[in-house]
Amino acid sequence: MSSRPLAVLIGSPGAGKTTVGRALAERLGVDLLDTDAEIERRAGKTVSDIFVEDGEEAFRALEREVVAEALASHPGVVALGGGAILNEQTRADLAGHRVVYLEVEFADAAKRVGLDTARPLLLGNPRARLKALLRERLPIYQSLATLTVSTSEHTPEEAAELIAKELPAAGD
């Protein structure tokens, strides 16, 4: 079996990387490595707590380490955190991988990350921030993708099926 991922899923928060990743890994009979979950396991705290307690720089450094290891040696499906593609070295490391961009409409992403409910003012405007993130990152996601699948138009199972059909048969 290959020591590189069969597929690497990228996309914004709420795109369904973990959910589609689970469905795809199950369909292919391999493991899913969700880089955010691996970061939490290594740090012993949530991504949110890492950001608050240690800062974004510390989070991004740990994320870079986890992503580099996954891209070099995980033989299943890898789901990257939404911002992992901001790292130049990560973008370079993605070259030659089967990178699947999970595209999502803003309204669906907002709903999936819980921004469709009333929020206290002290949070600022998280919907505007999410919209800005989607707009800023879109060209990067598109430039890295070898395949794009809409998770607004397809269920996670349908998305996994579409991705699986595009992957080479085992041994190719």
Swiss-Prot record:
Q: What does this protein do?
A: Catalyzes the specific phosphorylation of the 3-hydroxyl group of shikimic acid using ATP as a cosubstrate.
Q: What is its EC number?
A: 2.7.1.71
Query: What biological processes does GO assign it?
Result: amino acid biosynthetic process; aromatic amino acid family biosynthetic process; chorismate biosynthetic process
The residues that the entry says bind Mg(2+) are: T18
- Pfam family for this entry, one: SKI
How the cofactor is bound: the record states: Binds 1 Mg(2+) ion per subunit.
Alphabetical GO CC annotations of the entry are: cytosol
Cofactor entry: Mg(2+)
Q: Is-annotated flag, keyword Metal-binding?
A: yes
What residues does ATP bind to? G14, A15, G16, K17, T18, T19, R119
Give the species. Answer: Thermobifida fusca (strain YX)
Record's keyword terms, sorted: Amino-acid biosynthesis, Aromatic amino acid biosynthesis, ATP-binding, Cytoplasm, Kinase, Magnesium, Metal-binding, Nucleotide-binding, Transferase
Return the broad EC class. transferase
What does the subunit comment say? Monomer.
Catalyzed reactions: shikimate + ATP = 3-phosphoshikimate + ADP + H(+)
Q: Pathway, per UniProt?
A: Metabolic intermediate biosynthesis; chorismate biosynthesis; chorismate from D-erythrose 4-phosphate and phosphoenolpyruvate: step 5/7
**Subcellular location(s) per record:** Cytoplasm
Alphabetized InterPro entries for the sequence: P-loop_NTPase (IPR027417), Shikimate/glucono_kinase (IPR031322), Shikimate_kinase/TSH1 (IPR000623), Shikimate_kinase_CS (IPR023000)
Q: Which family does it belong to?
A: Belongs to the shikimate kinase family.
Q: What is this protein called?
A: Shikimate kinase
Please indicate if the UniProt record lists Cell membrane as a keyword.
no
Q: Which GO terms describe its molecular function?
A: ATP binding; magnesium ion binding; shikimate kinase activity
Positions with a binding annotation for substrate:
D36, R60, G82, R137
